[in-house]
Amino acid sequence: MYLQHFGLKHPPLGKEATELWDDGALALLQQRFQWLLDSPGVGLLTGEAGVGKTAALRVLTASLNPHRYQLIYLAETDFARLDLYRNLAIALGLEPAFRRAALWRAIKARIQELADGRNVLPVWIIDEAQNLPVEFFRDFPAFLNFAFDSRDLMTVWLLGQPGLAQTLNRAPYAAMASRIQVRLRLVPIAERERFKHLVEHGLQQAGATHTLLSDSAMELLRQASRGLPRQAGRLIQTAMRLAVPKGLNHLPDELIHEAIEVLQ
C-alpha cells in the first residue's frame, strides 16, 4: 500500500534495485570481479551485515552470459564440510556421491567437461561464508589443487562479515589465504554528504519524484542506520508505512523517530 501511496515502483534501497549508488567502491569491485572471470580464482568480499555485499554481487552477476558462465549461489553455509561439496555437485547437475574422493572426482570431471566441451566457467558465490565450518577452509585448497591441477576452471567468491578475513589470516588457514587472489571490503556510508547521495539515489531509483526527507530527518536516518544501506532502507520503508494512515506524502523527523522505535 505504501508503494502506491508514494508512487513507487519498488521499496527504496530494496533488493529490486537494478542500479546501485556508487562512489567508486562498486566500480572497483566490478573491476576485480572481471579479473576473476578473465583469470579464474578465489575472491574474498567482506563487510558488515547490511553494507551491500550480496546486493553488489547480485547486480554484477545479473549481466553474466548464461552460455558462458554458470552461476552457483550458496547462502546456507551452516552445513558439514561434505554437504557443501554435495551442494556444488547438485548445482552442476550431478548425483552427489557419498564418499569425498568420488564426490571430488565427479565435480572435477563435470567442471572440465564444462570448460572443454562448452567453454563455460562456473562462478560459485558462497554467501555468509563466516558460518562455514573451519574444516572447509583447511579442506578447500586441497580440493582446488585436486580439481584444477593444471589450470583454474572455476571462480569462487567468499562473502562474509569482517571476522572472516581475520579467520583466514590465522596460521591454520594459510593455504586457503594463499589461494585468495582478490580481497575487498565494503564499508558503511558514514559521511553525511555521501549518505545523502545514497538515499536520494535509492529513492529516485524506486520512483520518488519529490523530496521526502528534510536535512534533519536525513541525519536521523544516517545515525540510526549507521550508514548501512539495508538498515536505511528498512527505516525508510517503515516510515512510509507509518505515513500512509496519517495521509503524509513526506517523512518528517517525528516519523523517522517512530520508525526507529518500531525497529528497535
Protein language model annotation of sequence segments:
Residues M1-P40, H257, E261:
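A short, basic N-terminal segment
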Residues G7-L8, A175, E193, H197-Q264:
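C-terminal alpha-helical "lid" subdomain
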Residues L8-G14, Y69-L71, F79-F98:
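Conserved NTP-binding/hydrolysis module of P-loop NTPases
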Residues D38-V59:
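Walker A/P-loop nucleotide-binding motif
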Residues G43-T46, Y73, I125:
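Short hydrophobic/aromatic beta-strand immediately N-terminal to the Walker A/P-loop
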Residues T61-S63, L164-R179:
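Short regulatory helix/loop adjacent to the ATP-binding pocket of P-loop NTPases
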Residues L74-T77, T167-A171, Q181-R194:
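Conserved AAA+ ATPase "SRH/arginine-finger" region at the nucleotide-binding site
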Residues A80-D83, E95-D139, F148-D152, I189-F195, ...:
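Mid-core helix/loop region of P-loop NTP-binding domains shared across ATPases and GTPases
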